């Protein structure tokens, strides 16, 4: 179907846009402009802080607007424009301002894509379609990382900026090719069709009165506190070993992880209804904790690459399960997107704190101490998820699968 292909293309092209420059910015600033780890970690955190402040308002905006395609297109252009300004003005304050704008605009992507998906496919097909979304997203990330690695060998780290601009144009074409009249507005909000507005809980009641949603937000924050800084730290170690090959090696790390994420996302789409969400999410925490330990075993670039590939398991499971669990917890409330934005705010808090804290630990205690600390936080998050979170999959689906 046309709308399915358009949604595939949107997730593919948006993959390189939704996170801005990500770890490539760390390599670019370190290798080309001589920034230190603390300064690099700080500007990465600025994008995270801007994103977390904008996440909940962005979710509320997506709930309230019907023009979700236009909102997503504007956000993609804003992120691309902010990132493309960095090579022109590479000083601290211009880079910080660009990261601020990019982080705020990127807050729109997760709730907008989830809302469009739910509005197009409905609740029954949402798990399968979300797994497919994430598979295409990871395929796009793998393509972008491979292209960035190849282009950087010829043109240097500056190549990633041109690539981001091209992917932004692709995402613009994709989102505008989704038929606007195919998106059901009530479904896109997670609202029961035909339910009077007065019968809905308020957004505030949905966010604060749902203990499972609050517990999930805390676990998400810990997951990203443990995970967000790992790839930038690996990129810094690779750049220190060989400045000319740092970006290319980082791209190999990303490609390997993204290729693993594709089958993980497909697994979630195919089996999360039958197996339940909880065991899959716990597996993601376990692999993340193991990575933190394994990074300290050797400094060899190829070892770092192999360990980073394991990110594909944890992040692949997390990325696909995240909107599914929020949809489970907010079913029928009409506030799916603001809830998704609020939990993504917790995610942003964890990611921003991760980059800032890990940078400081590296400066004062070294890379191994930072990796071990991040791995320990992942183990703590897994324990809390096991203790606090119920199984959110429909109980009937689990019973049918098990019986």
Each model region followed by its residue ranges:
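Helix-loop boundary and gating motifs at the non-cytosolic
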Residues: 1-48, 214-215, 224-238
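Juxtamembrane intracellular "pre-TM" segments in multi-pass secondary transporters
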Residues: 1-2, 181-216, 403
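Central cavity-lining transmembrane alpha-helices of secondary-active solute carriers
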Residues: 42-60, 255-267
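Helix-to-loop junctions at the C-terminal end of transmembrane segments
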Residues: 54-67, 264-276, 362
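Structural signature of the two symmetry-related core transmembrane helices
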Residues: 70-84, 279-294
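Cytoplasmic helix-loop-helix junction between adjacent transmembrane helices
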Residues: 100-139, 325, 332
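A membrane-interface helix-boundary motif in multi-pass transporters
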Residues: 153-166, 360-378
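C-terminal membrane-cytosol helix-exit motif in multi-pass small-molecule transporters
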Residues: 166-188, 381-389
């Amino acid at each position: 179907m046309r709308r399915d292909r358009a949604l595939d293309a949107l997730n593919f092209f948006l993959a390189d846009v939704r996170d801005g420059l990500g770890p490539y910015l760390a390599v670019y600033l370190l290798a080309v402009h001589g920034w230190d780890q603390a300064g690099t970690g700080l500007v990465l955190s600025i994008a995270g802080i801007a994103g977390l402040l904008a996440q909940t308002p962005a979710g509320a905006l997506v709930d309230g607007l019907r023009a979700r395609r236009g909102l997503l297109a504007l956000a993609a252009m804003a992120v691309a424009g902010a990132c493309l300004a960095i090579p022109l003005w590479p000083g601290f304050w211009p880079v910080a301002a660009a990261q601020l704008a990019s982080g705020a605009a990127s807050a729109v992507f997760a709730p907008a894509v989830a809302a469009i998906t739910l509005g197009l496919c409905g609740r029954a097909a949402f798990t399968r379609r979300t797994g497919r979304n994430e598979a295409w997203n990871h395929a796009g990330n793998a393509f972008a990382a491979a292209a960035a690695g190849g282009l950087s060998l010829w043109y240097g780290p500056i190549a990633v900026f041109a690539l981001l601009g091209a992917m932004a144009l692709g995402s613009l074409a994709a989102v505008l090719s989704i038929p606007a009249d195919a998106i059901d507005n009530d479904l896109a909000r997670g609202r029961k069709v035909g339910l009077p507005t007065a019968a809905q809980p308020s957004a505030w009641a949905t966010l604060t009165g749902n203990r499972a949603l609050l517990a999930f937000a805390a676990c998400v924050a810990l997951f990203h506190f443990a995970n967000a800084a790992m790839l930038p730290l690996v990129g810094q170690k690779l750049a220190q070993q060989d400045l000319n090959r740092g970006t290319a090696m980082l791209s190999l790390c990303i490609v390997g992880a993204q290729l693993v994420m594709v089958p993980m996302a497909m697994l979630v789409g195919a089996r999360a209804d039958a197996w339940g969400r909880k065991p899959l999410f716990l597996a993601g925490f376990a692999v993340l904790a193991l990575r933190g330990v394994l990074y300290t075993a050797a400094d060899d670039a190829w070892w770092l690459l192999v360990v980073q590939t394991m990110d594909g398991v944890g992040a692949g499971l997390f990325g696909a399960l995240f909107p599914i669990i929020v949809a489970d917890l907010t079913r029928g409330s009409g506030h799916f997107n603001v809830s998704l934005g609020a939990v993504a705010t917790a995610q942003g808090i964890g990611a921003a704190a991760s980059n800032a804290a890990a940078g400081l630990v590296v400066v004062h205690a070294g890379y191994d101490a930072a990796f071990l600390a991040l791995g320990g936080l992942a183990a703590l998050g897994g324990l809390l998820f096991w203790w606090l979170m119920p199984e959110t999959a429909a109980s009937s689906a689990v019973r049918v699968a098990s019986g």
